[in-house]
Structures are given as C-alpha cells and as structure tokens.
Curated annotation (Swiss-Prot):
Region Disordered, annotated ranges: 120-153
Residue span of region D: 111-118
Gene that this sequence comes from: IGF1
Annotated disulfide bonds: 54-96, 66-109, 95-100
Protein family membership: Belongs to the insulin family.
Protein's name according to its UniProt entry: Insulin-like growth factor 1
Organism: Panthera tigris altaica
UniProt biased composition (Basic and acidic residues): 125-138
Amino acid sequence: MGKISSLPTQLFKCCFCDFLKVKMHIMSPSHLFYLGLCLLTFTSSATAGPETLCGAELVDALQFVCGDRGFYFNKPTGYGSSSRRAPQTGIVDECCFRSCDLRRLEMYCAPLKPAKSARSVRAQRHTDMPKAQKEVHLKNASRGSAGNKNYRM
C-alpha cells in the first residue's frame, strides 16, 4: 500500500519539477536574480530578531509605546536588582548599541499619574463666599453708621 499512496506524490513532484524547469528557461537571468533577492529578503526578515533604534527612531518608538505618560532616558530608581551597579545603562545603551524589544522600551515609560480630583464649583463658592461677604461687611461697618445710611458695594 505504501507504493500506491506515494505514487500521486511522486507524479506531483515530477510535474512540478518539469514546470519549474520550463519557467526557469523562460525567465531571464536578471529576473532570477531579483527573485532570489526577494526570497532572501523575506526569509531573513522572518527570522530577524529585535532591531536597533537610535536617535529620532528611538524617540518616536518611545513616544508611540509610552503615549501621554512620557519616558525616561535612564532607568528610574527602583529598576534592577541592586542599586550598587556602577555603570548605569540607559535606553541608548540598551536599544541603540544592542537590539531591544517592546518590553524593554516599556521599562522606560513614566508611570501613570493619578487623575487630579477637580474641586467642584459648589465647593469653591462655599469656601470663597463667606470671606468676600465678610470683607464687604467690614468695609460698610468701617464707614460708620452716621445717619443710618446703608452703603452697598
């Protein structure tokens, strides 16, 4: 049974090889060169690891990854296992001179800032109004009460 199931496979391989031979004779050497160059490019880019980022490309990548949080060029304190490391490495050392990945870039993002709680307008009026009313009352009182005149400000 093994020979019967492999017969269609062998026929396909043979026909495919014949098809390629005919196509190769039709293609010019320059076309073959460009086809080979494309194949090399696609295979090498598929196996390539993280790339290096320097200068404006590094800044653009950090802005994209970190967004509104911002980023640091040196690691903030608290990263790493020991604070006694003599040479402090930065993002340029890690991503420009060597290749780095997305996780490495995210390590240099600033932490999220907690949202500021806005004071309500009602709370501002409550705290500001008595002081203003008190000042007006004091000004009226300082003018005296001669003639029982009411002064308005």
